[in-house]
Amino acid sequence: MKRIAVVGTVHEEKGLANAAGLLAILERIKPELIFLEIPSAALDDCLTGSRSDLESAAVSRYRAEHVVDLVPVDLPTPEADFFTNNRDLFERIERTSPDYCRPVDWHSQYVRAHGFAYLNSEHCGDLFSQLRQATDSAIESLADQRLAELYDLWIRTNTLRDQAMMRNIENHCCQTSFSSAAFLVGAAHRQSIITLSRSEPGAASSTVLWEFSGFLEEPH
């Protein structure tokens, strides 16, 4: 049985959500391979230490002491205008919706205060659900066709990414022998990954045991 621990992360260090905390989780999981939320084109930068995100820093420190394979599973990075448009979209929502700002602020506070224990909790998933509802309501209230289209594109893009990452992991499981792996993914994707792991079974499903929180505590 292949065990895959799905670890919800953030890409920038904030309080207890830091590289040292993620490294401690990796030391508990002891993965033989790590699935990464990056496209194949970014793997070289990760291997050479050129990437500056939290996950890359923790993985680099783990690789210094352990033999581990790194497997990129994300789709190619969208064009720059995708990110520019999304920044404009959410800045517009933030200026007009207190119901959106509250869960954003709460999330930031919880990440800083509780780190990975929060990022891999039902509480975090519930807060992202509140955030999605507040965003939906704000888009409806703004009644701006362009913003609605940008929001739909953002949702579709992330849905396709989640599906592709799970498909790529499953394909790798069919082709490779291992006992323990970690999947480092932004916490905003975590609930979708949980849902996909429980949906229509694929060829590797019977040989994969998904783990979503057991790695948070030291083994007894």
Across the structure, where does each feature detected by a protein language model lie?
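Compositional signal for N-terminal targeting/processing segments
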Residues: 1-220
